[in-house]
């Protein structure tokens, strides 16, 4: 049976998620039935005419905090829509576990996700304690809300659904999939601004091309994200290719 993913999003700006449902690979996954994406707006679950979803924080301080009841109403309907699927509830938060490709692979194993996109200064901590299974962050910086991180997560996970990409090998060759940055890529013309496409890529020798791409990925990772190599065990071939890359770089 094909792997399919159901995603529910709780957000006061559901329109933002048209960027996911209407464009690119994620849109194609929706049309293929691989990805189901539905949004619930907490404002619908308010009881005042202003549809208030936030209030002042206890203890004072700047900003507002999202109230529990509207979030609970939206979450309850999202859970019901998930049907018999076991949905993991995720809050996008700067305090969460940082999203990496390894984490994306973990999330891609789930059958259903409910993503809580906060706003303002955040959401009432008691909602998190009562309802949230995991908190995830996309980096050590501050955004205006959880919608963009939620879209990043959905896009990254969708790429791993079988059939979502046009080429079966595309996801496996992405940066970080094997713990390395990606190698350089080239297309026509062969010469641009006196810079030629590397001859090995024009050779037609698949083994030479494979080794060149692996060496470039190793070298680029060593130059730009050496920390990734600290957590990765290099094979004998990889050690030789990286040593050769460094030697050629030092000689140039």
UniProtKB/Swiss-Prot annotation:
Reaction(s) catalysed (UniProt annotation): guanosine(37) in tRNA + S-adenosyl-L-methionine = N(1)-methylguanosine(37) in tRNA + S-adenosyl-L-homocysteine + H(+)
EC number: 2.1.1.228
GO cellular component: cytosol
Compartment list: Cytoplasm
Principal place of residence: cytoplasm
Residues bound to S-adenosyl-L-methionine: 118, 138-143
Tree of life domain: Bacteria
Molecular function via GO: tRNA (guanine(37)-N1)-methyltransferase activity
GO biological process: tRNA N1-guanine methylation
Cited Pfam families: tRNA_m1G_MT
Keywords: Cytoplasm, Methyltransferase, S-adenosyl-L-methionine, Transferase, tRNA processing
Positions in coiled-coil regions: none
CDD domains listed in its UniProt record: TrmD-like
Oligomeric form and interacting partners: Homodimer.
Function (record text): Specifically methylates guanosine-37 in various tRNAs.
Recorded family membership: Belongs to the RNA methyltransferase TrmD family.
Protein name: tRNA (guanine-N(1)-)-methyltransferase
Organism (species): Pseudomonas aeruginosa (strain UCBPP-PA14)
Gene name linked to the record: trmD
């Amino acid at each position: 049976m094909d792997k399919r993913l159901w995603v529910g999003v709780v957000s006061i700006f559901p329109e933002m998620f048209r960027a996911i449902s209407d464009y690119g690979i994620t849109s194609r996954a929706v049309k293929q039935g691989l990805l189901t994406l539905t949004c619930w707006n907490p404002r619908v679950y308010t009881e005042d005419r202003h549809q208030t979803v936030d209030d002042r924080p206890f203890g004072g301080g700047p900003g507002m905090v999202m109230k529990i009841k509207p979030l609970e109403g939206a979450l309850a309907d999202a859970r019901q829509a998930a049907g018999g699927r076991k949905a993991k509830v995720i809050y996008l938060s700067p305090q969460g576990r940082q999203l990496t490709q390894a984490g994306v692979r973990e999330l891609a194993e789930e059958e259903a996700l409910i993503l809580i996109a906060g706003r303002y200064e955040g959401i009432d901590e008691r909602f998190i304690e009562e309802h949230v299974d995991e908190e995830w962050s996309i980096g050590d910086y501050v955004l205006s809300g959880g919608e963009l991180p939620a879209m990043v997560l959905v896009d990254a996970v969708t790429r791993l659904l079988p059939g979502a990409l046009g080429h079966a090998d595309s996801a496996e060759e992405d940066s970080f999939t094997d713990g390395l940055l990606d190698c350089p890529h080239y297309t026509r013309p062969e010469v641009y601004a006196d810079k030629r496409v590397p001859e090995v890529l024009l050779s037609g020798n698949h083994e030479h091309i494979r080794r060149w791409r692996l060496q470039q990925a190793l070298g680029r990772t060593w130059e730009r994200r050496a920390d990734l190599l600290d957590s990765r065990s290099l094979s004998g071939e990889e050690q030789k290719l990286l040593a050769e890359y460094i030697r050629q770089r030092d000689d140039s």
